[in-house]
Design a protein with these regions (language model features):
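S-adenosylmethionine-dependent methyltransferases
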Residues: 1-135
Length: 135
């Protein structure tokens, strides 16, 4: 499981506690440091990495991901643009049953870019299959 823009990493911590193999990522050094301390304090093992969506090679090397999570990521236009290009590459829907579902789950508080982002995905043939947005 991959969490993008993890911040404090609550979804990543919860998934790791349930036994998932987790990589939690963020651009902010402070967020990464806090998540590492929180995981250590709670005895949770997960991988943590500082990643820019404009330089996604480390994430793509580990793709395809069965599940990609994110929350409140679409607060800037550039985030929406970068994610629109990146998400289908991170979690492609495989035709092989053993390759995973390639599911993307995003929770957004209703920011303006979220609507445009969802419309872009709905316009693409694979959009509805790989993407769900909860506002």
């Amino acid at each position: 499981m991959l969490e993008l823009g993890c911040g404090l990493g609550l979804p990543a911590l919860a998934a790791a506690l349930r036994g998932a193999d987790v990589l939690a990522t963020d651009w902010a050094v402070e967020a990464i440091a806090l998540l590492r301390r929180n995981a250590e304090h709670n005895g949770v093992f997960l991988r943590v990495a500082r990643v820019r969506w404009s330089e996604p090679e480390p994430l793509l090397r580990a793709a395809p991901w069965d599940l990609v999570l994110g929350a409140d990521l679409l607060y800037e236009a550039r985030n929406a643009e970068q994610l629109a290009e990146l998400l289908p590459r991170l979690a492609p829907r495989s035709v092989e049953p053993t390759r995973g579902r390639g599911e993307v789950l995003l929770a957004e508080p209703g920011r303006p870019y979220a609507k445009e982002f969802l419309e872009r995905f709905r316009a693409e043939p694979v959009g509805e299959r790989i993407f769900r947005l909860a506002c």
